[in-house]
């Protein structure tokens, strides 16, 4: 019996500004999409989002979203610590590997914390196939659940005109 092929869970929404935006429900689908954009050489002008449960949360609940504890949210120090480790050691590392650029360090980091949510901002500039681009990643967790929002954006950097 053949294995049933899993279809990517993605929705395309239109923002208020008229931008078409892909929203992924699983981290693997999000990463597969980004790899495809890099392979197609269309990586320098991408904006997409992912809303997913982090792997460590799913592992804890035996891959059953119904069993995820209500305490897994931005008010839980252990959850926040594990999420930050997941982002730094896995998500950013995977993006670095996609672009085959070990120098992509996301040096511009910041953290924004309110009662409702915690957002980590990462940004850096890179070059691939003679295209310079800026990459920005915002990772948000809220006080009302374990779902994580990732906002991924790349934009080209205009080539500097020669000084005469």
Curated annotation (Swiss-Prot):
Biological processes annotated in GO: energy reserve metabolic process
Keyword field: Cytoplasm
Region forming the signal peptide: none
Domain of life: Eukaryota
GO cellular-component term (any): cytoplasm
One Pfam family cited in the UniProt record for this chain: RGI1
Record InterPro entries: RGI1, RGI1_sf
Assigned protein family: Belongs to the RGI1 family.
Biological function: Involved in the control of energetic metabolism and significantly contribute to cell fitness, especially under respiratory growth conditions.
Designated name of the protein: Respiratory growth induced protein 2
Organism from which the protein derives: Candida glabrata (strain ATCC 2001 / BCRC 20586 / JCM 3761 / NBRC 0622 / NRRL Y-65 / CBS 138) (Yeast)
């Amino acid at each position: 019996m053949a294995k049933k092929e899993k279809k990517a869970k993605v929705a395309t929404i239109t923002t208020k500004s008229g931008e078409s935006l892909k929203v992924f429900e699983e981290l693997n689908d999000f990463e597969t999409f980004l790899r495809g954009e890099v392979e197609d050489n269309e990586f320098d002008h991408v904006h997409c989002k992912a809303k997913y449960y982090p792997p460590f949360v799913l592992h804890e609940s035996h891959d059953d979203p119904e069993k995820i504890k209500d305490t897994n949210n931005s008010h839980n120090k252990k959850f926040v610590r594990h999420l930050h480790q997941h982002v730094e050691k896995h998500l950013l590392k995977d993006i670095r590997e996609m672009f085959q650029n070990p120098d992509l360090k996301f040096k511009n980091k910041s953290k924004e914390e309110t009662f409702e949510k915690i957002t980590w901002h990462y940004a850096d500039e890179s070059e691939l196939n003679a295209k310079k681009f800026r990459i920005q990643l915002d990772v948000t967790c809220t006080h009302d659940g374990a779902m994580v929002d990732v906002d991924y954006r790349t934009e080209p950097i205009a080539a500097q005109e020669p000084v005469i």
